[in-house]
């Protein structure tokens, strides 16, 4: 009998089953290291093909003109087979989890994985904007808010990791979609304070495990570097430093 932290399929089996049907996927977002990171890590992990496009390139006009035409005026949007548009980052991640073999088969385990995922989503604000767009005094203000609150959250995340006897992920030796979201947020936190994870060996072990996943390792090595955080944040794309944000540079 399976425990609630076990899955009847091995990671390779789940990935191969999930990716046997390959829809056309286009992920539309901005020049930010934020809500599109987990989806891209998951797709790279599964070896799936997708296109990542800036909003202004996909829609052919500035976001300020396109926003009213997009569902709820929000990005990211995942376009499936040129027709179906999925918005809300959580909905995108859960859909992709079924395609990438990172959604548990067991309903109870699925609920527990989703609980961890939702907990990571609570780190989005102020973390994502603080790293990506805030500058000057505004950056310092929101950085202080995050650094004051995050240690308590991190302690709880570490405790959840330590409940897994098999590790190194939240629910054993296999990564689920919650693990990719946790990695993204933890890695952003280290941009604000490099040693912020160091008090918890379980978290450091988790980070190393995600970074060495096939596909993810290559993605992390090739994705745009973020620089000048807090002063004039930019992503280096094809060797060119481009300001972060919702506008084409």
Question: How does the language model describe each region?
Answer:
Residues 223-249:
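Acidic/histidine-enriched, glycine/proline-rich intrinsically disordered or flexible terminal extensions
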Residues 3, 9-144, 148, 237, ...:
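GST-like domain detector, emphasizing the conserved glutathione-binding G-site
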Residues 108, 112-219:
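GST-like fold's C-terminal all-alpha helical module
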Residues 54, 221-224:
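Acidic carboxylate-rich catalytic motifs and surrounding loops in phosphoryl-/glycosyl-chemistry enzymes
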Residues 30, 177, 223-226:
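Short, solvent-exposed turn/loop segments enriched in Gly/Ser/Thr/Pro and often Arg
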Residues 65, 197, 231-233:
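A generic membrane alpha-helix/interface feature
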């Amino acid at each position: 009998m399976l425990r609630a932290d076990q899955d009847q399929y091995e990671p390779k089996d789940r990935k191969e089953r999930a990716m046997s049907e390959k829809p056309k996927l286009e992920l539309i977002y901005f020049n930010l290291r934020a809500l599109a990171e987990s989806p891209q890590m998951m797709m790279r992990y599964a070896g799936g093909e997708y296109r990542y496009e800036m909003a202004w390139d996909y829609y052919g006009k500035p976001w300020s003109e396109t926003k009213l035409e997009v569902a709820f005026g929000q990005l990211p949007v995942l376009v499936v087979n040129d027709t179906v548009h999925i918005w809300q980052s959580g909905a995108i991640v859960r859909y992709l989890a079924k395609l990438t073999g990172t959604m548990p088969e067991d309903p109870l385990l699925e609920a527990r994985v989703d609980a961890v995922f939702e907990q990571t989503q609570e780190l989005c604000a102020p973390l994502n904007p603080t790293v990506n767009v805030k500058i000057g005094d505004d950056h310092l203000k929101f950085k202080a808010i995050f650094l004051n609150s995050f240690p308590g959250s991190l302690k709880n995340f570490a405790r959840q990791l330590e409940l897994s006897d098999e590790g190194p992920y939240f629910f054993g030796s296999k990564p689920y979609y919650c693990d990719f979201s946790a990695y993204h947020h933890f890695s952003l936190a280290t941009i604000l304070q490099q040693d912020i994870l160091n008090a918890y060996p379980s978290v450091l072990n988790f980070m190393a495990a995600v970074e060495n996943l096939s596909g993810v390792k290559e993605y992390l090595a090739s994705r745009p570097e973020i620089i000048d955080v807090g002063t004039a944040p930019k992503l280096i794309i094809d060797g060119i430093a481009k300001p972060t944000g919702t506008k084409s540079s």
